[in-house]
Amino acid sequence: MDNQLTTELKERYGIVFHDVNLLEQAFTHSSYVNEHRYLKLSDNERLEFLGDAVLELIVSQYLYLKFPELPEGKLTKMRAAIVREDSLAKFAKECHFDNYILLGKGEEASGGRTRASLLCDLFEAFLGALYLDQKVGAAKKFIEDVIFPKIDAGAFSHEMDHKTQLQEVLQRKGDVSIEYRLIKEEGPAHDRTFFTEVYMNGELIGLGQGKSKKLAEQDAAERALKSIPQ
């Protein structure tokens, strides 16, 4: 196994594998195995299968606890954005995993080292190997270091509704109280328009309207997001 990889994992993430064969397998692409059959190596596809499940469980639990007001559909949409191919490929590159993957000559020549699908699989395979080597706690710690800060910084906030986005932005500024107040209703019963104000610590920060109370609150939150520095 590349000593530089083991050194980087230890220095950046405090990870030291007990079974380095698992680490080597995680970074071994099937194309390399096919070109080096005499070495009797195993590729990373089975580890990828396991890592996919580990990642989904840990991310799901984090989103469930962090966003108690989000419905199932919103949580599912956000999780999908986090674990999709291009996101995981980006995480793999940020971890410098692309520098260490073992590829066959043909795969290397065709640009496999920068291919999103390959890097996504590599990231999941690494998680699978880490889980087998050190159980779920180590895998969770790694994801906490690599992925959770991006969630906290709002990298996937476009997957949330405006009220949740506003809550995230304001909570980063400290302990705040957010309140929505319905101030009036206009129009006939079959075509009402609702007007809502949103307050932060008692200060008005947004005014919205909509054909339901929920839509009026969403509009108020959206307007507040546009008016406050982030």
Swiss-Prot record:
Where is it localised?
A: Cytoplasm
A GO-annotated cellular component: cytoplasm
Listed binding positions for Mg(2+) are E48, D121, E124
- Quote the catalytic residue positions: D52, E124
Any Gene Ontology biological process: mRNA processing
Q: Which cofactors are named for this entry?
A: Mg(2+)
- Domain DRBM, chain residue ranges per copy: 161-230
Q: Which GO terms describe its molecular function?
A: double-stranded RNA binding; metal ion binding; ribonuclease III activity; rRNA binding
Recorded catalytic reaction(s): these are: Endonucleolytic cleavage to 5'-phosphomonoester
Q: Where would I find the RNase III domain in this sequence?
A: 6-135
| Gene3D superfamilies, alphabetized | 3.30.160.20, Ribonuclease III domain
Pfam families, sorted: dsrm, Ribonucleas_3_3
User: EC number(s) of the enzyme?
Assistant: 3.1.26.3
For this UniProt record, the keywords arranged alphabetically read as follows: Cytoplasm, Endonuclease, Hydrolase, Magnesium, Metal-binding, mRNA processing, Nuclease, RNA-binding, rRNA processing, rRNA-binding, tRNA processing
Which stretches are annotated as coiled coil? none
PANTHER family (UniProt xref): RIBONUCLEASE 3, RIBONUCLEASE III
Subunit notes for this chain? Answer: Homodimer.
Return the similarity comment: Belongs to the ribonuclease III family.
Its function, per the record, reads: Digests double-stranded RNA. Involved in the processing of primary rRNA transcript to yield the immediate precursors to the large and small rRNAs (23S and 16S). Processes some mRNAs, and tRNAs when they are encoded in the rRNA operon. Processes pre-crRNA and tracrRNA of type II CRISPR loci if present in the organism.
**What is the protein's given name?**
Ribonuclease 3
- Species of origin: Enterococcus faecalis (strain ATCC 700802 / V583)
